[in-house]
């Protein structure tokens, strides 16, 4: 696990340096997915120590809405209709000289099936007031905005 984590971090830093040098921006799509009990879905990747909102990068020519529908299906086995995807907020984030624009959606209606992703080590549902300790800082801020009605920030 440590080798995969270290390899990912090195590859990610190299990629971000190249993107920065080329002046590229990136766009990502993530979702606050809630269930009927009011719990939120979080994922833990094989290459990161924290819990995150599910989602990922937007492919060339793909809309952010299509990206979150695809990512939820690939990562956690959720099937979401386009009409059940509601925009929450768009943020700006800089990492290693690259501007990233995470787009967050709210998902309340979906069906699920068993999915296996090499990227996801663990997925779990949590009540907002019982989140695990290792939630990423950005994820925690987004959940505060949604569940505690904290002001929505512009920066990730």
Describe these PLM feature segments:
Residues 115-147:
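NUDIX/MutT-family hydrolases
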Residues 1-30:
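Acidic, metal-coordinating catalytic segment for phosphate/diphosphate chemistry
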Residues 35, 39-75:
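Conserved Nudix-box catalytic region and its N-terminal flanking loop in Nudix hydrolases
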Residues 79-89:
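A short coil-to-beta-strand element that immediately follows conserved catalytic motifs
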Residues 91-114:
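Active-site-adjacent beta-strand/loop module that shapes the phosphate/pyrophosphate-binding cleft
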Residues 33, 104-108, 127:
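Short, well-ordered beta-strand micro-motif
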């Amino acid at each position: 696990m440590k080798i995969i984590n270290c390899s990912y971090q090195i590859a990610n830093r190299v990629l971000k340096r190249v993107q920065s040098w080329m002046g590229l921006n990136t766009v990502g799509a993530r979702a606050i997915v809630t269930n009927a009990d009011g719990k939120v879905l979080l994922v833990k990747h094989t290459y990161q120590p924290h819990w995150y909102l599910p989602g990922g990068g937007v492919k060339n020519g793909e809309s952010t809405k299509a990206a979150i529908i695809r990512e939820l299906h690939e990562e956690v086995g959720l099937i979401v209709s386009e009409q059940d995807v509601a925009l929450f907020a768009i943020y700006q984030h800089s990492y290693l000289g690259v501007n990233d624009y995470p787009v967050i959606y709210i998902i309340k209606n979906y069906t699920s099936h068993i999915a296996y992703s090499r990227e996801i080590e663990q997925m779990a549902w949590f009540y907002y007031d019982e989140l695990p300790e290792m939630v990423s800082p950005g994820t925690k801020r987004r959940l505060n905005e949604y569940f505690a009605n904290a002001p929505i920030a512009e920066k990730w």
